Regions:
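Canonical RING-type zinc finger of E3 ubiquitin-protein ligases
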Residues: 27-36
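Pleckstrin homology
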Residues: 112-129, 154-235, 241-277, 282, 308-362, 383-396, ...
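Long, non-globular segments of proteins
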Residues: 1-17, 93-94, 107, 114-120, ...
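Short cysteine-rich clusters marking metal-coordination/redox-active sites
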Residues: 21-24, 41
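Intrinsic disorder
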Residues: 3, 11-18, 34-35, 65, ...
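Cys/His-rich, Zn2+-coordinating zinc-finger modules
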Residues: 1-13, 42-126
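Disordered regulatory linkers adjacent to lipid/PI-binding modules
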Residues: 128-131, 259-322, 328-329, 333-348, ...
Length: 415
């Protein structure tokens, strides 16, 4: 039998804003933080519980017993009022998570709101400064080992640099517990541990051309990112992680904020809302597909495909530093299209073929399941219909120039 307080809670759920999770926006929240006065989903409730009862006191709407004072608090606040308070000064560059986003993004969003109160106190948003210095574990280009590297972000120079740390600090287990990143140093006011590093950077990445995405499932670490950029006309991937989820999220946000500021300088008359749409996005889709060359005698090869906005890249393995090939997907009005093939292709694993048609050639691809093919067709079709941006045109010109000037290694090869 439903008691009086539970009936009141169900009525409160019908008020505007209360019918979705206050943190991730998922429908039908069945939990609440009664001291904060918000309705939340089960996933976010577990994060609230992890912050401790001194920050958030969590109860199930139906399974727990509610006191009158707790219900009154829910009535006084609610999701809309709580958002107005705890999200008052969210920077435009900050990525607001949704229910399908990585755990680290949702968790740090919640902790930033209620634990650190970053959006009530803008001075705590150090990722807006345009500079950041710290250490991340980086995967080797030629091997799978992760080594400690110093990273330096400088918005004024439009660069993200990284360089070797000393051999004595090459393992996460020993050094990451002793190294204080930029955010920690600002609070401590002094550096207790020093790390020697080479003066010359090992790599210099252009922030304005850099894409960054969380990659926990691919890298196998909850607090990990993939950095993607063009190097000598080809795409380069860098994989990094940090043991502290707050640190990796701050790096992610600092890169987004720096990129937005650079876009505002480059396109001063473009509305900020349009520029935000150009900030780094997660890959539209990744996964295994079968690929074959244009000749009937060509064999099917299993490749890891990644769709990054308009670049469809394929690799031998998911964590390769470079793709084996890259296909630019232009607008459908320029001769690009996707076709479903229902004919057999001679490969029992590649049961669901489809063709990506470009002005230069047709790429013969295949998925293992009907559902997987449908997923790829959907995201590629979206890319075909989307108008090209100036960045898209730059990438297209770079890839075409690479294709026409390189005879030994072609990014449009049949590999």
């Amino acid at each position: 039998m439903v008691d009086h307080n539970q009936k009141l809670l169900q009525e409160l759920l019908k008020k505007p804003g209360n019918n979705v999770c206050a943190d991730c926006g998922s429908q039908g929240p069945d939990w609440a933080s009664y001291n904060l006065g918000i309705f939340i989903c089960m996933r976010c409730a577990s994060i609230h519980r992890g912050m401790g009862a001194h920050i958030s006191k969590v109860k199930h709407l139906d399974l727990d017993r509610w006191e009158d004072s707790q219900v009154q608090r829910m009535k006084e606040v609610g999701n809309v009022a709580a958002k107005n308070k705890y999200e008052e000064r969210v920077p435009p560059c900050y990525r607001r998570p949704t229910k399908n986003d990585p755990q680290v993004l949702i968790e740090q969003w919640i902790r930033a709101k209620y634990e650190r109160e970053e959006f009530c106190h803008p001075e705590r948003q150090s990722y807006l400064s345009g500079t950041m210095v710290g250490f991340l574990m980086k995967r080797g280009k030629e091997d799978s080992r992760y080594q400690l590297r110093k990273f330096v972000l400088n918005e004024n120079e439009d660069t993200l640099k990284y360089q070797h740390a000393s051999d004595g600090c090459s393992r996460a287990s020993g050094c990451l517990g002793r190294i204080f990143d930029h955010l920690r140093l600002k609070n401590l006011g002094r550096l207790r541990y020093h790390v020697k590093e080479n003066k010359e950077p090992k790599g210099v990445l252009k922030l304005s051309e850099l894409n960054v995405s969380f990659a926990p499932s691919k890298i196998g670490h909850m607090n990990s990112m993939q950095l993607t950029f063009l190097k000598d006309g080809s795409t380069r991937h860098i994989y990094v992680y940090h043991e502290d989820p707050e640190v990796i999220n701050c790096w992610y946000t600092a890169i987004r904020c720096a990129k937005l500021h650079l876009l505002q300088v480059a396109f001063p008359s473009t509305p900020q809302s349009d520029l935000i749409l150009r900030l780094p996005k997660d890959f539209a889709r990744e996964g295994w597909l079968w690929k074959t060359g244009p000749r009937p005698s060509d064999v099917h090869r299993r490749r890891w495909f990644t769709l990054d906005t308009r670049k469809l890249m394929y690799h031998d393995e998911p964590l390769d530093a470079y793709p084996k090939g890259e296909i630019f997907i232009g607008h459908e009005s320029n001769g690009y299209q996707i076709k479903v093939s229902n004919t057999g292709n001679g490969c029992k694993e590649a049961r669901f073929p489809f063709h990506l048609v470009t002005p230069e050639r047709t790429f013969c691809l295949a998925a293992t399941t009907h559902e997987d093919r449908a997923g790829w067709l959907a995201v590629i079709q979206q890319a075909l219909k989307r108008p090209l941006t100036p960045q898209d045109s730059t990438i297209e010109a770079t890839l075409v120039r690479k294709r026409t000037t390189s005879n030994s290694i072609s990014i449009f090869s049949g590999r």
